[in-house]
From Swiss-Prot:
Its EC number is 7.1.1.-. One of its GO terms (biological process) is aerobic respiration. NDH-1 is composed of 14 different subunits. Subunits NuoA, H, J, K, L, M, N constitute the membrane sector of the complex. It comes from Xanthomonas campestris pv. campestris (strain ATCC 33913 / DSM 3586 / NCPPB 528 / LMG 568 / P 25). It catalyses: a quinone + NADH + 5 H(+)(in) = a quinol + NAD(+) + 4 H(+)(out). Pfam families: NADHdh (PF00146). Its main location: membrane. HAMAP family: NDH1_NuoH (MF_01350). One of its GO terms (molecular function) is oxidoreductase activity, acting on NAD(P)H, quinone or similar compound as acceptor. Keywords: Cell inner membrane, Cell membrane, Membrane, NAD, Quinone, Translocase, Transmembrane, Transmembrane helix, Ubiquinone. This is NADH-quinone oxidoreductase subunit H. The keyword Iron does not apply.
Amino acid sequence: MNELLLNVVDPLHQWFLGLGDGGVLLWTVLKILLIAVPVIVTVAFYVVWERKLIGWMHVRHGPMYVGMGIFQAFADVFKLLFKEILQPSSSHKAMFIIAPLLTLAPAFAAWSVVPFDAKLVLSNANVGLLYLLAMTSLGVYGIILAGWASNSKYAFLGAMRSAAQVVSYEIAMGFALVGVMIASGSVNLSQIVFAQAGSSGFFDWFLIPLFPLFIVYWVSGVAETNRAPFDVVEGESEIVAGHMVEYSGGAFALFFLAEYANMILVSFLISIFFLGGWLSPIQGWVTADISPWVNWLWTGGWPWLLMKVFFFASAYIWFRASFPRYRYDQIMRLGWKVFIPLTIVWIAVTALMVFYGVIQKGV
């Protein structure tokens, strides 16, 4: 991977810069495509995996046609793109169209600072953690706008639920990341991973000393993405599809894409903040040099990150198939009366662990 960056990406970057302002613009467009295209393709296969896994849990087959079910999601996208986008006559026309774009843009923009390996990151920003908090907070504005612009009581009720839920759990997520920042001494995502490197393998990860914050961040991530059992925003039995009830065709597909892109993003972030990112769980236990195709098992690399992400992404599906939906008041009580006090207490505990040397990589 490093050879690819050195021999292909860097010369290509310099060539674009040599074209002047137009080259800079083209390079920016290329970087946007490098984010958007892999995310869209990953979401498509993730949807197929979700339908297959839930099918197996329900003792069904799941998708079986369109390439044995593998390309079912692509067929669904093709169908949605050619459906008519209907707008309620009483809706606010401009805001109705802007809302799904405003939801999708932050979901894509957040990926620009996510490191896949020590050298594989689009923008190795020194304030990556703060940037992520900002981007993940912006998506709710599109949801609120969709509920208001639809001029529907069901859509507006779903939007208000989403606003309250996201604000509530955003606080808990932010406090959980304060603990990560104290333990690592950095807000750079790559440096947070390096702070978990050591000769003890997974014992050096933040999962063990910050376990309560890990649970809070994981559950809050599920609530932030409005997934089961926290899916009161679009509870089918109560408010049909919530803020998306008046949307159809490509506009509905954009909301759908943003939701699943955020689910995969949260899976990446949990792996980076608490499970050592691309680090191997047995790093430092084996020092043999066999071949580059085998060494990653104990030295770490992007395959380890993808395996961790796959586990958390599959857990989203397991939650959906297993747990009943919480009531709205139960969700609010969990966020405000349990998670926020717990994170505040554990921030103090983390500071003490850093001060007394229990966590060696802190400030």
